[in-house]
Amino acid sequence: MRAAQTVKAAGVSRAARPVRANVVCKAQKVEFGQAAAAVVAASALVAGSANALTYDELQGLTYLQVKGTGIANTCPVLEKGSTDLSELSAGTYKLENFCIEPTSFTVKEESVFKGGETEFVKTKLMTRLTYTLDAMSGTLKVGSDGSAELKEEDGIDYAATTVQLPGGERVAFLFTIKQFDGKGTLDNIKGDFVVPSYRGSSFLDPKGRGGSTGYDNAVALPARADAEELLKENVKSTKALKGSAVFSVAKVNTATGEIAGVFESIQPSDTDLGAKPPKDIKITGLWYGQLSQ
C-alpha cells in the first residue's frame, strides 16, 4: 500500500509501512449480522516500532516534511502505555483526534467452483494515500464492570476508495464508520454504522439520468422508459446502507489520555445509485484516539 522507501523528517527516520501487522495478537471470533469476522485484540500494538510516528512526532513535522511521503495517511501510534485495560478508570470520556488507518481490504466473492462457498479475497488498492479517516470525535463510556460504549459523532469520517479484484474488476466504496454506535467490553466493542451513498443525488450517469436532476429515462429508449428491467437504471437511489464493525483497545496511556487498538469492519460497496447489488467489503487496520473528561 505504501512505497517501500525511507522518509527522514525532523530527525525521525521512518520506513514506509507496507504492512503494520507485525503485531503480537490474540485471535477472537466475533459475528455481526450475516457476516462473520475475526478481530484481533493486540497484546502489543506496534509501539516503539521504527516504522511508526507518535502524535507529538507527527505534530512536529512541517508541511514540506510531510508532502509526498504518505505520512499524512497514517495514524499516530502509542509508544508508551499499558496493555492492562483495567488501568482505564470508569467514566465518560470525550474521544478526540480519533483516527482509523486501514491495513487490509478484502472483498467477498463467490467461489469459482460450482457449489463452493463465498469467501473474502485479497485486493489491490487503487486509491492513492487518502483513505485514512482522521480528526474524528466521539464519546467512550467505560463501566466499572468492564463494559464499554463507543460512539463516533463528527470529523473526516468517510473516504472514497477503490480496490481491484484478482480478475481485474474494480470495486468502489465509501470507507466510513459514520455514526458508529457500539457496545461490549474494551477488547470487543461491536456495533453498526451508516454507509452513505457513494454518489450524490445530483450525479448524472452516462445517459444523463440522476436522482434530483437530469433525464427520467434513457433518451434513446423512449418507448421502453417504463420497462421493468430498466427501472433500477432510471430510478436512482441514494439510500444509506448499514455496516458493522468491531473495535478492540490494545493499549492505553492514562498519563497522556492516549488510546490505541485494532479494528475490523464489514460494509457494502457502491451500488451505482441502486443499479447493482453491493459487495461486502472487509476492512482491517489500526486506530488511535485521545481521551479527556
Curated annotation (Swiss-Prot):
<keyword id="KW-0934">Plastid</keyword>
<keyword id="KW-0604">Photosystem II</keyword>
<dbReference type="GO" id="GO:0009535">
    <property type="term" value="C:chloroplast thylakoid membrane"/>
</dbReference>
<dbReference type="GO" id="GO:0010207">
    <property type="term" value="P:photosystem II assembly"/>
</dbReference>
<dbReference type="GO" id="GO:0010242">
    <property type="term" value="F:oxygen evolving activity"/>
</dbReference>
<dbReference type="GO" id="GO:0042549">
    <property type="term" value="P:photosystem II stabilization"/>
</dbReference>
<protein>
    <recommendedName>
        <fullName>Oxygen-evolving enhancer protein 1, chloroplastic</fullName>
    </recommendedName>
</protein>
<comment type="function">
    <text>Stabilizes the manganese cluster which is the primary site of water splitting.</text>
</comment>
<dbReference type="InterPro" id="IPR002628">
    <property type="entry name" value="PsbO"/>
</dbReference>
<keyword id="KW-0809">Transit peptide</keyword>
<dbReference type="Pfam" id="PF01716">
    <property type="entry name" value="MSP"/>
</dbReference>
<keyword id="KW-0602">Photosynthesis</keyword>
<comment type="similarity">
    <text>Belongs to the PsbO family.</text>
</comment>
<dbReference type="InterPro" id="IPR011250">
    <property type="entry name" value="OMP/PagP_b-brl"/>
</dbReference>
<keyword id="KW-0150">Chloroplast</keyword>
<keyword id="KW-0464">Manganese</keyword>
<keyword id="KW-0793">Thylakoid</keyword>
<dbReference type="GO" id="GO:0009654">
    <property type="term" value="C:photosystem II oxygen evolving complex"/>
</dbReference>
<keyword id="KW-0472">Membrane</keyword>
<feature type="transit peptide" description="Chloroplast">
    <location>
        <begin position="1"/>
        <end position="53"/>
    </location>
</feature>
